[in-house]
Design a protein with these regions (language model features):
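Catalytic cores of nucleotide-sugar-dependent glycosyltransferases that transfer UDP/GDP/TDP-activated
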Residues: 1-208
């Protein structure tokens, strides 16, 4: 079965999804209404990390379990493989909040709880990033560690979506800044069928 390029699934990935830190939050907030209008709420999802200190004022959590998936959703729905992927990862111990971001357009969003997997997977993922891509990481750099965890969770999630989707849709992953971009070399190394986009902003990386 050939993948549907016209009705592709778009995932926008940033550490500022549902997490107001700097300018990227404003960029995402500004583009959300037109993106949701073009893609609808089933083909466009934002992905970020769960900031427990502030996420509750940014989102409305959406109920999702296997009963809802099997009894209230159709396998023909564009977002069925996305919901199934979330549930499969939850079964493996990954903390995930599935929600509606309370900004204009109300994009569906997926927030990963990095602490839910930090102790179990971080060292293995740091080793894999070095072995597979030659990218080193400091032992105790919290920011880099978070970027690695988020990157591997995004890669894992996209792999689950591809498996559940059975090649019905093309997938596009748009990553904002290096903090959300670790998934890019991992996706390429694993040869996942995902179109990737990287945008850098008014940061040190973007300017120089």
């Amino acid at each position: 079965m050939s993948r549907d390029l016209t009705n592709h699934l778009l995932f926008e990935i940033s550490t500022e999804v549902c997490n107001k830190v700097g300018g990227i939050y404003s960029v995402l907030k500004t583009k959300a209404p037109i993106t949701v209008k073009e893609y609808g709420t089933k083909r466009y999802h934002c992905i970020g990390l769960l900031n427990r200190d502030k996420y509750e004022v940014e989102i409305e959590e959406l109920p999702l379990d296997y009963d809802i998936l099997h009894n209230k959703c159709s396998k023909d729905d564009d977002d069925y493989p996305i919901k199934e992927a979330i549930l499969k990862m939850r079964d493996r111990g990954v903390g995930i909040v599935y929600c509606k971001w309370l900004i204009e357009g109300s994009p569906k969003s997926i927030l990963f709880d990095l602490d839910s997997v930090r102790g179990k997977y971080l060292n293995d993922w740091k080793k894999d990033l070095w072995v597979s891509n030659g990218i080193p990481s400091p032992d105790s750099d919290f920011e880099t560690n978070d970027a690695i965890i988020l990157g591997y969770l995004v890669t894992w999630f996209l792999g689950e979506v591809i498996y559940s989707d059975q090649q019905k849709h093309a997938l596009v992953a748009h990553c904002h800044e290096w903090l959300a971009g670790v998934c890019l070399p991992v996706i390429r190394h694993r040869k996942l069928g995902v179109v990737t986009i990287f945008t850098t902003h008014a940061t040190l990386l973007g300017r120089y």
